[in-house]
């Protein structure tokens, strides 16, 4: 029997190395088997990259990370060019191995005790009025990273103008839910976001280590202690789910008092990741948006390129995002 591979702290595992560690086997997709992207998924590149380069340089100079880059988001050029970014705290190595995600897996380094202050100063210098903070999963920390989130929220508000809004996209705090909620109810964001990602039938394949009901409970329990804070979640489609399954998840979210929802197309980061089952037509996204409005979501963004933090400021303001 072979011994498990011991990974040194700080070493990033990606693609085939990362997929080899998950409980469900993912067979690499041959190039000729990959579905061709339809026209509605083509991303327009900006005429100038000056603003993009400025934001990247600001992050590099302070040792900060953006989920836009680490997760290979297709909207990076648009968002960076508009001076917005979603910051990823607690390092760039995740303790989970989700086969849909392009973030590296491994043994993370200890959290940077100066990250919160550096983040606050960077956001102040960027002069943004809406910021999204997310993180890798940190199952190695006693509180799952909740206190670090709280420290970042505090520092952002201390260094920025009073009208800045902060949205957090948190992990599931597996085994540490109440500890995390107790911490974040005191240093609350303006929007508390946690993504369900997919339908419960696909959790074993797409979210190994996560639990559908646990994620729902996290959203509901935070709403119970901070009813004044908007809650939000996100879903990917194109993994093999049915429309009926998505609608059931949407109903579950409303039953757990979730206010806002994003729905977007899953895009395969590499041939080693879980393959795209199908590309969902924009008309179907619109049907889901209409259904969400009828269910009572205060805001729902549904479209092929929609992501949790895509135009998050407009989402929070109630404007249409597709």
Curated annotation (Swiss-Prot):
It comes from the Bacteria. SUPFAM superfamilies: Radical SAM enzymes. One of its GO terms (cellular component) is cytoplasm. Its cofactor is [4Fe-4S] cluster. Residues 80-298 form the Radical SAM core domain. [4Fe-4S] cluster 2 binds at residues 94, 98, 101. Binds 2 [4Fe-4S] clusters per subunit. One cluster is coordinated with 3 cysteines and an exchangeable S-adenosyl-L-methionine. Pfam families: LIAS_N (PF16881), Radical_SAM (PF04055). It catalyses: [[Fe-S] cluster scaffold protein carrying a second [4Fe-4S](2+) cluster] + N(6)-octanoyl-L-lysyl-[protein] + 2 oxidized [2Fe-2S]-[ferredoxin] + 2 S-adenosyl-L-methionine + 4 H(+) = [[Fe-S] cluster scaffold protein] + N(6)-[(R)-dihydrolipoyl]-L-lysyl-[protein] + 4 Fe(3+) + 2 hydrogen sulfide + 2 5'-deoxyadenosine + 2 L-methionine + 2 reduced [2Fe-2S]-[ferredoxin]. It is an enzyme of class 2 (transferase). Pathway: Protein modification; protein lipoylation via endogenous pathway; protein N(6)-(lipoyl)lysine from octanoyl-[acyl-carrier-protein]: step 2/2. Keywords: 4Fe-4S, Cytoplasm, Iron, Iron-sulfur, Metal-binding, S-adenosyl-L-methionine, Transferase. [4Fe-4S] cluster 1 binds at residues 68, 73, 79, 309. It is found in: Cytoplasm. Its EC number is 2.8.1.8. Gene3D superfamilies: Aldolase class I. Belongs to the radical SAM superfamily. Lipoyl synthase family. PANTHER family: LIPOYL SYNTHASE, LIPOYL SYNTHASE, MITOCHONDRIAL. This is Lipoyl synthase. It comes from Idiomarina loihiensis (strain ATCC BAA-735 / DSM 15497 / L2-TR).
């Amino acid at each position: 029997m072979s011994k498990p591979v011991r990974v040194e702290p700080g070493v990033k595992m990606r693609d085939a190395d990362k997929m080899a560690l998950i409980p469900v086997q993912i067979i690499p997709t041959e190039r000729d088997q990959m579905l061709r992207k339809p026209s509605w998924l083509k991303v327009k590149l900006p005429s100038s990259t000056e603003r993009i380069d400025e934001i990247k340089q600001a992050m590099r100079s302070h040792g900060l990370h953006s989920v836009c880059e680490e997760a290979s988001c297709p909207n990076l050029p648009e968002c960076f060019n508009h001076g917005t970014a979603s910051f990823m705290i607690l390092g760039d190595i995740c303790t989970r191995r989700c086969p849909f995600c392009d973030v590296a897996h491994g043994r993370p380094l200890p959290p940077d005790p100066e990250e919160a202050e550096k983040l606050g100063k960077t956001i102040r210098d960027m002069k943004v009025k809406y910021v999204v903070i997310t993180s890798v999963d940190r199952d190695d920390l006693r509180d799952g990273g909740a206190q670090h989130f709280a420290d970042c929220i505090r520092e952002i508000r201390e260094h920025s103008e009073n009208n800045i809004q902060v949205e957090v996209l948190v992990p599931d705090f597996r085994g540490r839910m109440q500890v995390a909620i107790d911490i974040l109810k005191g240093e609350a964001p303006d929007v508390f976001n946690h993504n369900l990602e997919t339908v419960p039938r696909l959790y074993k394949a797409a979210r190994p280590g996560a639990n559908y009901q646990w994620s729902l409970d996290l959203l509901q329990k935070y709403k119970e202690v901070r009813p004044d804070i908007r809650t939000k979640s996100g879903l990917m489609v194109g993994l093999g789910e049915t429309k009926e399954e998505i609608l059931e998840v949407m109903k579950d979210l409303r039953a757990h008092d979730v206010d806002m929802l994003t729905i977007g197309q899953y895009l395969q980061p590499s041939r080693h990741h879980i393959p795209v089952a199908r590309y969902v037509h924009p008309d179907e996204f619109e049907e889901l948006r209409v259904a969400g409005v009828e269910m009572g979501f205060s805001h729902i963004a549904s479209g092929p390129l929609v992501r949790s933090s895509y135009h998050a400021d407009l989402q929070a303001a109630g404007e249409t995002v597709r």
